[in-house]
Amino acid sequence: MRRITPVVLALLLAACSSGSPPSTVRMPDGVREHAYVMGVETVDNGSYVVIVDRAQFLTGDEANRAAVEEGFINEGETVPGGYYIVNDISELEELRLDPGAPVALNVCLDDGECDVPTGVSATLWVDMLNGDIPDGQLDGFKWYVGGNLPYTLILNGEMIVGIEEQYLP
């Protein structure tokens, strides 16, 4: 059994060092909140503050009820795509970002496959949001960020400890 362990470890390391980004990202435990990320600022000590507008991401019957209440659809209809985002109060908040927080983005791989959940560091995510990534720095994938995207934030108190880009069909 001891001989298999180094072989398995070598295979895992080889897979991790290839040009393909990982397809799964393990998120920490915490409170999950939906929000639009409006921007990221660097504060004096070099840490980040994420500017968010919290929202509700609803699916199924709950989404249909909310959409009917807001006049988006008529009674008996269903929301397009199976989801509805409620953002009745547009209020910006500043939340601290744990520099070690994992970030899961929906990217397009260089081979053409899209909407692949891919993990990046919090620092790389901030650089991509701020447009600081030169061409070629993203090895193996492209992330098409446009506007203020919805995310699921994993919070520990007022600290963001994980971020998942919300997939929108």
Residue ranges and their predicted role:
Residues 19-169:
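Solvent-exposed hydroxyl-ligand-binding patches built from regularly spaced Ser/Thr
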